[in-house]
Amino acid sequence: MKSINILSFLLLSSTLSLVAFARSFTSENPIVLPTTCHDDDNLVLPEVYDQDGNPLRIGERYIINNPLLGAGAVYLYNIGNLQCPNAVLQHMSIPQFLGEGTPVVFVRKSESDYGDVVRVMTVVYIKFFVKTTKLCVDQTVWKVNDEQLVVTGGKVGNENDIFKIMKTDLVTPGGSKYVYKLLHCPSHLGCKNIGGNFKNGYPRLVTVDDDKDFIPFVFIKA
């Protein structure tokens, strides 16, 4: 009988301890879990680096290049003789698609606590750095159209035209470990990787739903 009483006492003590523990974490005293959100003031996001290991900087010119064998740099092209070229393509080791990339600059809507350094998974707008007419001066910022194609015609500050850069684990054939992927991240939706697809005979940049499907990129100072 004594052993039963001792067991009952232990069970009751354990129950009361659990109740007290649970009550100590109310809405007024919540459990704070670790976070990886870039809004956490205590988290310093890694810098994005160019192919040579230098930090990517806002306003400076870069070539966005696919380092894989047979692939090439991103460039601006005119499909259909439009007044303003708006197709964002990728050079390839095919005669009609050989060539140099078009320089881009990364810009922000306003000044940032990050200074002029681009950091992973922070908001940037991508803009081709090209000579253009007054008619097309506002047609150089990247966006994604209704066909999920990356085109120009976006606007700095438009929440639908936001891009972000994420580090990958890939290493280039030349040994560079600074390989990234681009994501389209409209504020009202989740991010989607930028991949590639032949559309009407052209190697287009497109958004893709599969998280494992993306084009790897390195950034080369122009």
Curated annotation (Swiss-Prot):
Gene3D superfamilies for this protein: 2.80.10.50
Motif Vacuolar targeting signal in this chain: 29-34
CDD domains, A to Z: beta-trefoil_STI_CPI-like
Residues making up the signal peptide according to the UniProt record: 1-26
Induction, as annotated: By wounding. Also expressed in upper non-wounded systemic leaves.
Keyword Disulfide bond: yes
One family name in Pfam for this protein: Kunitz_legume
Database matches in InterPro entries: Kunitz_inhibitor_STI-like_sf (IPR011065), Prot_inh_Kunz-lg (IPR002160)
GO molecular function, one term: cysteine-type endopeptidase inhibitor activity
One term under GO cellular component: vacuole
Intracellular or extracellular location(s): Vacuole
Keywords: Disulfide bond, Protease inhibitor, Signal, Thiol protease inhibitor, Vacuole
Disulfides per UniProt: 84-136, 185-191
Cited PROSITE patterns: SOYBEAN_KUNITZ
Expression sites (tissue/organ): Tubers, leaves.
Record propeptide residues: 27-42
PANTHER family assigned: CYSTEINE PROTEASE INHIBITOR 1, KUNITZ TRYPSIN INHIBITOR 2
Role summary: Potent inhibitor of cathepsin l (cysteine protease). Does not inhibit trypsin or chymotrypsin (serine proteases). May protect the plant by inhibiting proteases of invading organisms.
Protein family: Belongs to the protease inhibitor I3 (leguminous Kunitz-type inhibitor) family.
Protein name as it appears in the record: Cysteine protease inhibitor 1
The organism of origin for this protein: Solanum tuberosum
